Design a protein with these regions (language model features):
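Conserved SGNH/GDSL esterase-like catalytic core that processes O-acyl groups on lipids
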Residues: 19-101, 124-134, 138
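Secondary-structure boundary/capping positions in well-ordered alpha/beta enzyme cores
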Residues: 46, 75-76, 113, 147-150, ...
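Conserved beta-strand termini and adjacent loop/short-helix elements that scaffold enzyme active sites
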Residues: 51, 118, 153-156
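Alpha/beta-hydrolase-fold catalytic nucleophile elbow
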Residues: 80, 118-119
Length: 200
């Protein structure tokens, strides 16, 4: 199943433009970013390139970093990936390790590039694996605290009500993918962070 998912993700990956924008903000990751249909307008006037694709896992991010991310020479990378790893039963340590390897590869090639890690969603469909989601998020938050070029951003508060219950109105019927109001909440949290990182 993992092989089939990786193959499907590779086939779904969009091709980079012949002359892509460089020096901007690149969004990498899985469907949460890929399906953010109003990303560019909600982040305007920030220069956004979105190379996320459905079904991707953290191993895909490692495979594409040299060919599809580093050539764009982004000033900032927004990273959301790991949710599909969780669904496949991967342990937190393995997921975290691949995320850190991605960051380290970027830092080696582009030492001035900032990486903004967006927390993995505690989606209702994965409630039985929230402990893994929380562990990955916690480990990356700790990593970011000791690496000045990395920032951790928690978007999960958008997805829960005042009683700590998931806001099902923000999810599609699969209780995994998000409706437009969820992305509005994400933009309110993420845009100030990216604006600051891009301006530094």
């Amino acid at each position: 199943m993992a092989v089939a998912l990786a193959l499907a993700a590779a086939l779904a990956a969009p091709a980079l433009a012949a002359q892509p924008t460089t020096g901007g903000i690149v969004f990498v990751g899985s469907s949460i970013f890929h399906r953010w249909t109003r990303l560019e307008s909600q982040m305007a006037p920030l220069p956004i390139t979105n190379v996320a694709f459905d079904g991707s896992v953290t191993a895909d991010m490692l495979r594409m970093v040299d060919s599809r991310v580093i050539p764009l020479r982004p000033k900032v990378i927004a990273y959301y990936c790991g949710s599909n790893d969780v669904a496949l039963g991967e342990p937190a340590a393995a997921i975290t390790g691949r995320i850190v390897r991605f960051i380290e590869r970027v830092s080696t090639a582009l030492p001035d590039t900032r990486v903004v890690f967006v927390s993995i969603n505690r989606a209702p469909s994965k409630e039985d694996r929230w402990d893994v989601v929380d562990d990955v998020n916690r480990q990356i938050k700790m990593y970011a605290a000791s690496h000045p070029h990395v920032e951790y951003v928690d978007v999960n508060p958008v997805l829960f009500d005042a009683n700590g219950k998931p806001r099902l109105d923000l999810y599609m019927g699969d209780e995994l993918h998000l409706r437009p109001p969820a992305y509005e909440g994400f933009a309110n949290i993420l845009k100030p962070v990216l604006t600051r990182a891009f301006g530094d």
